[in-house]
Amino acid sequence: MEDSHELDLTYVTERIIAVSFPASCSEESYLHSLQEVTRMLKCKHGDNYLVLNLSEKRYDLTKLNPKIMDVGWPELHAPPLDKMCTICKAQESWLNNDPQHVVVIHCRGGKGRIGVVISSYMHFTNVSASADQALDRFAMKKFYDDKISALMEPSQKRYVQFLSGLLSGAMKMNTSPLFLHFVIMHGVPSFDTGGACRPFLKLYQAMQPVYTSGIYNVGSENPSRIRIAIEPAQLLKGDIMVKCYHKKFRSATRDVIFRLQFHTGAVQGYGLLFGKEELDSACKDDRFPDYGKIELVFSATPEKIQGSEHLYSDQGVTVDYNTADPLIRWDSYENMSADGEVLHTQGPVDGSLYAKVRKKSASDTGIPSSPQGMPATSSPDHGDHTLSVSSDSGHSTASARTDKTEERLTPGARRGLSPQEKAELDQLLSGFGLEDSASSHKDMTDMRSKYSGTRHVVPAQVHVNGDAALKDRETDILDDEMPHHDLHSVDSLGTLSSSEGPQSTHLGPFTCLKSSQNSLLSDGFGNGVAEDHNGVLSPDLGLGVDTLYDRERMCGGREQKPLQPLLRKPSAPTPVQAYGQSNYSTQTWVRQQQMVAAHQYSFASDGEARLGSRSTVDNTGLAQPPPHIPVTPNRGASSRVAVQRGISNGPNPPDTQQLCPGKALQPRFQDDRVTNGVHQEPNTGSSPGSPTLDIDQSIEQLNRLILELDPTFEPIPTHLNALGISAVCPDGVGSGLRCSGRLDSVDGPGRSPGRQGDDPIGGRLRKLSIGQYDNDAASQVTFSKCGWGKAGVDPAPSLGSFSSPEDIKETVITAYPSDLNMIDGRIPNSKESSMCLTPSFPVSPETPYVKTSPRYPPFSPPEPQLSSPASLHKGREPRGCPEIISHTVGMSESPVGPKPTMLRADMPATPNFQQVFASSCTVSSNGPGQRRESPPSAERQWVESSPKSTLTLLGNSHPSESPLGTHEFCSSGKDSPGLPCFQSSELQASFHSHELSMSEPQGALPPAGSQTFLGFNTVTTATSVLPPGEDAGTLLVNSHGTSPAPGTPLLTTGAADNGFLPHNFLTVSPGASSHHSPGLQNQNVSLPGQPPLPEKKRASEGDRSLGSVSPSSSGFSSPHSGSTMSIPFPNVLPDFCKPSEVASPLPDSPNDKLVIVKFVQDTSKFWYKADISREQAIAMLKDKAPGSFIVRDSHSFRGAYGLAMKVATPPPSVLHLNKKAGDLSNELVRHFLIECTPKGVRLKGCSNEPYFGSLTALVCQHSITPLALPCKLLIPERDPLEEIAENSPQTAANSAAELLKQGAACNVWYLNSVEMESLTGHQAVQKALSMTLVQEPPPVSTVVHFKVSAQGITLTDNQRKLFFRRHYPVSSVIFCALDPQDRKWIKDGPSSKVFGFVARKQGSATDNVCHLFAEHDPEQPASAIVNFVSKVMIGSPKKI
């Protein structure tokens, strides 16, 4: 049958068609037959067929067929386990979308690949077996038995059996580390005359060579077995192939003795035994003895197995270690892609120009990326890296389902599973899980690799059983970033896990030699995935059939139908979705510069205001996926805890940070009924449910197992995560965007637990079907807008109840940005992330050693268009870019306190209003003259969640790209004479409270021109000038100007009697009155960017303290916690205990006396440097004026702070001891200890020093009067680091040292290394390049990872074509420069600049070697690398 020269088209079932072409048929015959088949399919099925191409990718096949998935793998081989799941999922998804859909399985060559797909899908559909599918399964079984089974290879059958066992639950996954020590051949094949054999082994992991043995020469005595020792032992994980060759005697050819493929998850114990019938190639080769067997011996550690010394030597067998022979090194799988496509699953692409080895530049699609870290072939003596993913991360999960999804059936939807089927699936899913990795997904017709999901570059290194060939290699070192790597992505010896799938304790026909295995997952399966990839929910299939099919499933129709909205009707008990924007961090060149971070969260109550995610097309920025996504627990924590957390809606997983490529096809969303982030609910209900849901869950769980083994694995998306529409990055933002987000599910009292959503806004970029975009003219970038909308009226909402006092936590309101790109919805450009520990080289300026603070010109926001929550459903939306800043954790069920109401906060609708709360959000509220469209009985509610309550700052942010400037808040009120106006560019507030709420009369309308801003009703006019006698702000006055209802807690902040703070930062006028509420007894207002502080006291309580809070438990954040500007608040709260204030009502109109609010710039970012040392503080201050100071974290006293200040003259004791005048400069910097006590912070050892509520208060007071200090403090107006960098070359050198300590890395082309004798300088680079250009044959070039650190330059061959790793210490690197003649190097694209560095030849004191490189990424020029090496690495030791 295989030798037939005609095509074979078979209807396996009515909807599954198998089309095969023999490999021997001519190209002309193939094309002719292909055209006939295409015409027949189009005539009979129209465009309702999907082609699964199991062979190599072909342009003509793509051209003739509208929908095609290239999922091929090498002929006669087994596919990776994840690819089998991908194909099954694609079939199931396509066939369930439309009854008219059919699947065409295309294969040119051996039909064994068709057999793999048919049999896998047969087992796959058996998971949710139904009577109507029984006939199809029978037809597939008959086709398999009659036509295909005999044509399949043993490894193909082994993989099908393994998948069947996993799906049925008959097999368990083994995640124990497996180190291969021996491959023993029982029975010697007879390949040469006289029965001789010269075998050698090659080990492949994810189709990448990881080990090559020496050549074993079997003597004439012909021993009964050959023991091939694997030295060092190889850690194998995932899809493994062992291929044994025979090297012909006196011939440059080799024959395959046997080939076997298996998955490490199926290995039980530490031994495998394969008979001849289980070996590919050997099963049909008469030269392999019938009694022959192959035995694999594993262990859990790389150390030699005790008692196995006799296995290392065989009499009559000699080993040739000449593995430099090209025949031995040749990888037959290296050039499987004829068109030069990437032969691996692309790793995370963060747009970073200098991604680490395990990443890949977004601009280069032809160069495979490589895993980062030490390869498995490293010497086993690195004991600190011998723990594998499974053994050190604790990823054992309870046998519980991690996804609790609610799906509502619509008329016409497929029936759900029966309870019995549900129980079976529960059993199946007890250990499976899926969490999408950040692998970039391929387009259906434009995949980067025809072996997607199977090709992970695992650097190949030829290892021999000895010390040969070491003279050709330079030092192999461990990457100094290894300790910082998440071991979830690096195996026990540093090898990045390749494409691996589930593991089992049973391997089908394998004969297990040992079963004494300590399973790490005895009660479940690993469910973690690659680090920082949590929730990158990309609905495509990893191979292109993404939104086209999933959208049809969601909508129950074709792609022309709109997306199914993701928010259910109010009547459906839906878990609350909370939305969070990024928590980003920016590494700066100077280590002392503070990181800027911001958290933005929001939540909506069930039946009340709901937060949605806008999916309509907008020009303003980044797309954000809808929040209706099930969460799977993160890696990093105990998986058992994570599973329980996922089921019980406990604490949410930590924020994840995901990377987003710079350019992309931009999807078109057609849901025109979505406005301002609130999805309108149609009458059709929610997404249809079907057995697909359960299979989706099964595949999710199965893929989680694969990801447990291989963090780089590209999972198979399912319907569950298809709802999470991936975001795309705007073209103009740049390639360094990092986007992440978070969905927090908050359960209030009486609300049924639901699933948590974790939905990064920046998810992995997806390329959608070209056919889906043929009518997309606009091709605009989407931006998700968030807003509040009334989803319904709950007459008796069971939402709010105050927490008990002991549940009080701190919630930080972070209003940033330092990079004001957030104004238009973009994420600040950050090339460094938690995933990229080594930053890229600085480009512009070429080598900045001190990063200056950004300066932002002021701007005035336009007049916002405000809309009520109900109006959001009617298509109205605010003009501003809404970004909700809040942080919700959970609802306390304490039954105390009144029903909370909404705290409204709107920016004044005046063009001249100076916006302070940067990047704040527009909340839907009643604008002037607008009616509330919600029923009169509805009460606008916004509830502060306890125990971690939140005040949300809601304002209007400008959609333009102009950054936010400094703004002034000046009051014309008569109650604030003499108080100055201060500037503030970024404000941050932190509140301790039970409940911050504000009542609003039903149906109330705000007066024209007034808007509530942070609870202060600010009356504005066209010119922002108030009439005489009016104050600028009102404290806690609702939009109608009426007082809150009795018993409603009030937000009142200020300083009543603050003797130490004459300049009150937030002043409440003495005449302001407020209601007293017990719920506010423990409310605290403080600076979030301050050290741990105690609770503050009321003015009327004297010295009585409401309670002491230790620094470690108070919840206060220190100044370096991420904010650069803060709102300083006094250390004494308004006195609520005075009867006069309790009795006096709030003013009823803006004409009454109002509260005056003053803001002042927080300068803590200038004087608080947490991580600097005592010596660095001295260096910063010794040339400053007396009174200059720095506050830092004390290194000697944990939890305390050190105050270093410059004084005019040193103390007399110092003058007496130090007679030398030269020593006095350092003695002029004096050091004081600031201790943290339950009462506050104070200078230690000074009896006349009072306690202060914050560091800011202490500093401010001492800037007014010195108290116990030698002189008053001078509050700086700019960062002293910048000043020193400008004035002192020594500090620049220190900054360079810090920069070098941080290191920089990139990928470059390695061209050649040329010996230069003693020549150095530009001449050496010029001569080396000239010699390279004329060299015949030209030297082989390859992509290497080029890392510069304090240790020197480290080169890692991404594919190990030329070497593994080379290290050049700092002391050996002499010179680095561009080619003086500016010659370019051309390699499959635009020309690149050439640079090189000169280093001492190893073992020589005079000879030099020039190493040449070329730019790999044009956006990262060679000049940046040269500058870094020359000025930072080579230059810094000379300066310091």
UniProtKB/Swiss-Prot annotation:
Expressed in brain, heart, lung, liver, spleen, kidney, stomach, small intestine, skeletal muscle, skin, thymus, testis, uterus, placenta, aorta and trachea. GO terms for molecular function: guanyl-nucleotide exchange factor adaptor activity; phosphoprotein phosphatase activity. Residues 363-380, 387-400, 613-622, 646-659, 677-690, 943-960, 1067-1087 have a biased composition (Polar residues). The modification Phosphoserine is found at residues 332, 361, 370, 440, 516, 571, 648, 687, 690, 769, 804, 860, 894, 960, 1144, 1149, 1288, 1436. Residues 1-170 form the Phosphatase tensin-type domain. Residues 175-301 form the C2 tensin-type domain. Disruption phenotype: Mice display growth retardation and incomplete development of small intestine, lung, and bone. Postnatal lethality is detected in one third of the homozygous mutants. Residues 1305-1439 form the PTB domain. Gene3D superfamilies: 2.60.40.1110, Pleckstrin-homology domain (PH domain)/Phosphotyrosine-binding domain (PTB), Protein tyrosine phosphatase superfamily, SH2 domain. The modification Phosphothreonine is found at residues 323, 632. Residues 358-421, 607-662, 675-694, 740-762, 846-881, 887-906, 920-975, 1067-1123 are annotated as: Disordered. InterPro entries: C2_domain_sf (IPR035892), PH-like_dom_sf (IPR011993), Prot-tyrosine_phosphatase-like (IPR029021), PTB (IPR013625), PTB/PI_dom (IPR006020), SH2 (IPR000980), SH2_dom_sf (IPR036860), Tensin-like_SH2 (IPR035012). It is found in: Cell junction, Focal adhesion; Cell projection, Podosome. Its EC number is 3.1.3.-. Phosphorylated on Ser/Thr and Tyr residues. Phosphorylated on Thr-323 in the C2-type tensin domain following EGF stimulation which changes its binding preference from DLC1 to the p85 regulatory subunit of the PI3K kinase complex. EGF induces tyrosine phosphorylation in a time- and dose-dependent manner. Phosphorylation of the SH2 domain enhances interaction with PEAK1. Residues 1094-1104 have a biased composition (Basic and acidic residues). May act as a protein phosphatase and/or a lipid phosphatase. Involved in the dissociation of the integrin-tensin-actin complex. EGF activates TNS4 and down-regulates TNS3 which results in capping the tail of ITGB1. Increases DOCK5 guanine nucleotide exchange activity towards Rac and plays a role in osteoclast podosome organization. Enhances RHOA activation in the presence of DLC1. Belongs to the PTEN phosphatase protein family. This is Tensin-3. It comes from Mus musculus (Mouse). The gene is Tns3.
